[in-house]
């Protein structure tokens, strides 16, 4: 990529694979690599505009959200430690909100034992099974990641997975795949980060109802 653009290596801050896909439209399948280059001096980008017809300039999309200016009286509560709850709690924890997470099922190791027991005996634990417990239903999948191209949340989730031990190629493969064993370790690691940042996770704790007074949570 640097050679095609005639970019000296010392001017590149980063150069790597951004995406790998397969083009099978014309008979024999062809691997198509999309490369991403970040220059140390962004002001020099325009100088390489005509180096190749395949070159385009883009600004990476990153997930961001606005933070209010009123202090919270209580910690935010996240219900469930499935994929949505896990990343909601992670984002809140990284933003300094010390979330309280309520999960009706057990932590991952106990949950795995309960599922193995069910597979052997047929005895179902209503709170520790393939649906409920740390990691949610995805914990017992094979770790395939469904992407939403162009959604900045993709980068946030992918970066979190990479920071917690996922293979580097999930950042650029067309159909990224983590694998069950690695996925479970990643989930534990994310939970540990949430706790380290002041969050709290309460397992075997089900939300059974909400108390409403004057049209608001009491």
Q: What spans do the regions from the language model cover?
A:
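Extreme N-terminal leader/targeting segments of oxidoreductases
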Residues: 2-74
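Phosphate-coordination loops involved in phosphoryl transfer and adenosine-cofactor binding
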Residues: 72-75, 171-173, 204, 217
């Amino acid at each position: 990529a640097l050679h095609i653009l005639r970019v000296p290596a010392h001017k590149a801050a980063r150069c790597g694979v951004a995406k790998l896909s397969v083009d099978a439209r014309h008979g024999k399948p062809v691997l198509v690599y999309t490369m991403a280059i970040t220059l140390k001096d962004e002001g020099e980008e325009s100088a390489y505009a005509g180096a190749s017809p395949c070159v385009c300039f883009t600004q990476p999309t990153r997930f961001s959200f606005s933070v209010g200016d009123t202090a919270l009286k209580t910690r935010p509560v996240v219900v469930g430690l499935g994929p949505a709850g896990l990343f909601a709690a992670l984002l809140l924890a990284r933003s300094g909100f010390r979330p309280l997470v309520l999960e009706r099922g057990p932590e991952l190791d106990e949950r795995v034992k309960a599922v193995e027991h069910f597979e052997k005996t047929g005895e179902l634990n209503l709170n520790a099974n393939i649906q409920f417990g740390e990691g949610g239903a995805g914990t017992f999948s094979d770790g395939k990641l469904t992407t939403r191209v162009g959604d900045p949340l993709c980068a946030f989730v992918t970066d979190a997975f990479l920071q917690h031990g996922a293979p580097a190629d999930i950042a650029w493969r067309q159909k990224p795949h983590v694998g069950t064993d690695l996925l479970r370790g990643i989930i534990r690691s994310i939970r540990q980060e949430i706790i380290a940042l002041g969050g709290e996770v309460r397992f075997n704790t089900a939300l059974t109802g909400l108390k409403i007074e004057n049209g608001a949570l009491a």
